[in-house]
């Protein structure tokens, strides 16, 4: 049986552009029947888009999305999970794995590597590595991110894994770990391949992971130009020159893919990420990305509803040393809503009953669905136990077993 509890009172504090919200006392649980075996659904940003505050401008791209990095919500999308050709957006994963190797001490920024014959002869964009001159890892990273150098990509792949083929195996394993369900890589560069694809959703996932997991390396994405081997090349992300709030991330282009761009903007402490693919030109991908970023920042608020590990309610526990467990969220909870509508949010707690001891802190016990004024789900978040509950003794467990048996007779389960 699923227990449903409406948390009626939210304390709203307005600070500048951002609405801050904090929960107050919860009302008594409201019961709702549901199969006992059903598990709480995990939050799915694509399935819980906020209701549009104002009309989304026309986006001229074959696929796109815009995402709020605090709440984890997709605010608008088109062909979110369809396979697309990433082109040099592939290098987001190449860079992610290099950042990981640096973090783990497997590479050092001042280590040097010489471009292989494969890397030197590779087609497409390059940083113009000299086969006679070893290059430092930190220079190779700038050549990869700023200049989109395929020679830099292959050299870094070989530095991390010994060969590009072995590096590609790491890329696919990391994609799986990150939950990129519609991605498969064939190379580190983004050159076309029959089984080289990703999706807009997966690019959002990867981009958010870079920003969250490796903030110390993220400033590389805002570099406007880089000189190597006496050759200066500009960053092809035109938004870096046009919008002071934009600080990344990566461009991509092939004849078959069109012009792609992952862009990120941070304004007044709030970050949004956009993806556009299949546009007609460098100018077009910048213009369409700018539309998405500005629409998201101007049309939506992302209030903080709960601090990390704040108890929002108690849930009845059977067969436990304690009769109830405090539930809440592991991390601070943000929800993105149309501008000015934060006060209308109504959180509804749902737990699968019965909740049986033993319970470990951090164990998922249900979800909170955030409903708008029309009773539509805006977002949902897993709710977890905030404390351990040990198992009761023999007689305590026996008594609760009897209680649950009688409850099942009357509930029909």
Regions found by a protein language model. Give the residues of each.
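Domain-terminus/edge residues, biased toward the C-terminal soluble/receptor-binding domains
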Residues: 180-184, 192-197, 201-413
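Bacterial N-terminal signal peptides
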Residues: 8-16
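Structural motif marking the loop-to-transmembrane transition
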Residues: 2, 86, 137, 391, ...
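Active-site-adjacent loops and short helices of periplasmic peptidoglycan-processing enzymes
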Residues: 22-204, 208-214, 226-229
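Bacterial N-terminal signal peptides that target proteins for export
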Residues: 1-7
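Hydrophobic alpha-helical membrane context
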Residues: 15-16, 103, 300
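Sec/Tat signal peptide C-region and signal peptidase I cleavage site
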Residues: 17-21
């Amino acid at each position: 049986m699923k227990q449903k509890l409406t948390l009626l009172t939210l304390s709203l504090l307005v600070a500048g552009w951002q609405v801050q919200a904090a929960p107050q006392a919860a009302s008594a649980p409201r019961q709702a029947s549901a199969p006992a075996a059903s598990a709480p659904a995990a939050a799915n940003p694509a399935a819980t888009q906020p209701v549009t505050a104002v009309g989304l401008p026309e986006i001229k791209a074959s696929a796109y999305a815009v995402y709020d990095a605090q709440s984890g919500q997709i605010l608008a999308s088109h062909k979110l999970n369809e396979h697309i050709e990433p082109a040099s957006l592939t290098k987001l994963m190449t860079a992610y794995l290099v950042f990981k190797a640096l973090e783990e001490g497997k590479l050092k920024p001042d280590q040097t590597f010489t471009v292989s014959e494969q890397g030197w002869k590779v087609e497409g964009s390059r940083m113009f590595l000299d086969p006679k001159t070893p290059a430092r890892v930190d220079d190779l990273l700038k050549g990869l991110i700023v200049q989109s150098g395929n020679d830099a990509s292959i050299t870094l792949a070989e530095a991390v894994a010994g060969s590009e083929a072995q590096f590609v195996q790491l890329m696919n394993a990391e994609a799986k770990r990150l939950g990129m369900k519609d991605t498969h890589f064939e190379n580190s560069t983004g050159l076309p391949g029959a089984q080289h694809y990703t999706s807009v959703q997966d690019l959002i996932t990867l981009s958010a992971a870079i920003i969250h997991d490796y903030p110390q390396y993220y400033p590389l994405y805002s570099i406007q130009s880089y000189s190597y081997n006496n050759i200066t090349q500009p960053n092809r992300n035109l938004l870096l020159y046009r919008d002071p709030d934009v600080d990344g991330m990566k461009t991509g282009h092939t004849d078959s893919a069109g012009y792609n761009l992952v862009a990120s903007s941070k304004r007044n402490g709030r970050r949004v990420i956009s993806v556009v693919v299949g546009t007609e030109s460098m100018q077009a991908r910048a213009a369409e990305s700018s539309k998405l970023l500005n629409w998201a920042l101007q049309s939506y608020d992302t209030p903080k509803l709960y601090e990390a590990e704040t108890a929002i309610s108690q849930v009845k526990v059977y067969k436990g040393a304690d009769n109830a467990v405090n539930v809440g969220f592991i991390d601070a909870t943000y929800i993105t809503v149309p501008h000015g509508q934060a006060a209308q949010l109504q959180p509804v707690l749902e737990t699968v009953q019965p909740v049986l001891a033993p319970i470990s802190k951090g164990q998922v016990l249900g979800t909170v669905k955030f409903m708008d004024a029309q009773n539509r789900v805006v977002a949902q978040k897993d709710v977890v136990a905030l404390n351990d509950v040990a198992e009761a003794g023999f007689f305590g467990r026996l008594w609760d077993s009897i209680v649950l048996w009688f409850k099942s007779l009357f509930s029909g389960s």
